[in-house]
Regions:
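Short, hydrophobic/amphipathic alpha-helical patches that form generic packing surfaces
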Residues: 50-61, 84, 88
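Substrate-binding/catalytic groove segments of enzymes
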Residues: 47, 62-66
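Non-catalytic, well-ordered alpha-helical scaffold segments
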Residues: 31, 35, 48-56, 80
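Membrane-embedded hydrophobic alpha-helical segments
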Residues: 1-3
């Protein structure tokens, strides 16, 4: 029984280490992508509207639902950024608006503009 407990503890430790490495990699690509998406959402274009609604969906999905097929209207770079941010938001340490400086005010302006 003790051997099982030792092996199980080792497995859990290795799993946690892998998750920490993965989380760091996801954040390394997700945070810059989030910053680019915020800039895009503050512009005035059809893509800006899609990105703004996407970000609001992550911010509060029940209040600001987002239709996934809208992502088809984005260019490849914005689409990739959305996927990176979505992956980062899958198991967040913080809410999406808390990951950027001035996020609360930025997201309030996105609500006023795109909700």
């Amino acid at each position: 029984m003790q051997l099982f407990e030792t092996e199980h503890a080792k497995y859990l430790h290795q799993t946690i280490q892998r998750m920490q490495v993965q989380r760091a990699a996801v954040q390394a690509s997700g945070l810059p992508a989030l910053k680019r998406l915020v800039v895009a959402a503050q512009r005035s274009s059809g893509q800006s509207a899609v990105v703004g609604r996407f970000l609001l969906g992550l911010y509060n999905g029940p209040t600001y639902p987002f239709t996934l097929t809208e992502l088809r209207g984005l260019d490849q770079e914005l689409h990739s950024d959305c996927m990176a941010v979505l992956l980062m938001d899958w198991s967040p340490e913080r809410e999406v608006h808390e990951m950027i400086e001035g996020g609360h005010h930025i997201f309030q302006s996105l609500i006023a503009r795109w909700a």
